[in-house]
């Protein structure tokens, strides 16, 4: 506020030295006040600017340190179908499957009526079907006939090949099914079998679950190999899996046809590449390894020491470290990058496609080959924003609405892809996520993240069959999480491997529409009633490709 001019015009004759001195003081004070007002206005503007910056940095710090605790996030609506109301007809869920479908009669019992009047004529039978289950002990005593030849040699009958130990195939399959399919802990299995009249100890149940499972381990490993060889994409995720009282991790790799689980003490990229390499032990520095090292910015002083070819440079981890030491490459970061590159090279040499799309939630260890990102996980970065003002909340809602609409357009594109629609969707992505908002640091940061990962989010435009989310991977890993809540961690290496193997085989059977119970019986009996799962995966993928080409 500017001070008014001097209110009194004092004649020159009355301007004594005192009056002049007072006038000078008043004029000086007026200039000082005007200067202070200007300074205050500048400081207020600066304070407003700094407050906005501090608020943005505070939001970023809270997100980085997770100071808010576990956020209460509502379920995403991105994948919910738009349900159209039905007019008339039956209520939802009222259509029941016929009980006569595939009904197999094991026993027929004829029931005659009581007090039948004399002279009644037989009119046929009225069917009444009952489903029941027989659970009882069935002990078998094999009498192995023994003969002595004329030469004095003894010949004895042989047990059936599927008979291993003193427990039959059905009982062994039942124990495996209860533990892995029904998630029944070992103590309850022991109690259950004893109530059925089976004489068995806790140690014997443990051995039935752990020992002589090499064929299952082999099949599960070949399921992974077949899945990686035939897949155009795989989804992946991991979760905690304690072992021997220490932290550990379980990683799942799969798609619509298979699931593979593997537990380890690390969730690093090196560990993930070991899974992709499978059961092989070699290290290969080929051209794909070279491209990986360049992308990861391996120093040139190390790069010039290497020779790249399709030949193996080492067999086993110790030999690989010795090879690098021989090249005078000893820094931890360089050894780490070269190990990852050699593992990647080995995996590709053994059949892994360099164009394989890996769909994940954004964890860095999965960002290899052709990486695709989950839209649902990216959308959470916007949904978590608090919105400190009404304007900020309005901006967040507008972005979410545009994002959901764009997501639905991507789903429509998956059904009917075209070049024109692909180009339009790329441009539309820039229109939505290229926007920036004044004084909304958190939203701008989220939009920058979308732009930085544009290619990974839009893999679907080049490969429409790739899902837009990792819901399937989370459903796979949830199987392991449920088991962990019931039984806790593992104590023995064999138990850890058995849990991984049978969890993967169970999920694979479910995806291929096979009964896990029939699968267990088939493998333990040694017949081919359930085909070899890796062969089924290859055959199914060939059928899908032929169908796609025919269309």
Report residues per predicted region.
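Inter-helix linker motif
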Residues: 372-385
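Short, flexible loop/hinge motifs at secondary-structure junctions
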Residues: 1-166, 206, 236, 281-338
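Flexible loop/turn segments at secondary-structure boundaries
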Residues: 184, 212-215, 241-244, 267-271, ...
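RNase H-like nuclease fold core
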Residues: 63, 195-198, 202, 207-360
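Acidic/histidine-rich catalytic cores and adjacent linkers
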Residues: 311-334, 350-368, 397-551
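Short, charged amphipathic recognition helices of the HTH superfamily
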Residues: 181-192
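Short, amphipathic alpha-helical "recognition" segments used to contact nucleic acids or chromatin
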Residues: 170-182
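Mobile genetic element proteins and their domesticated derivatives, centered on retroelements
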Residues: 22, 29, 50, 57, ...
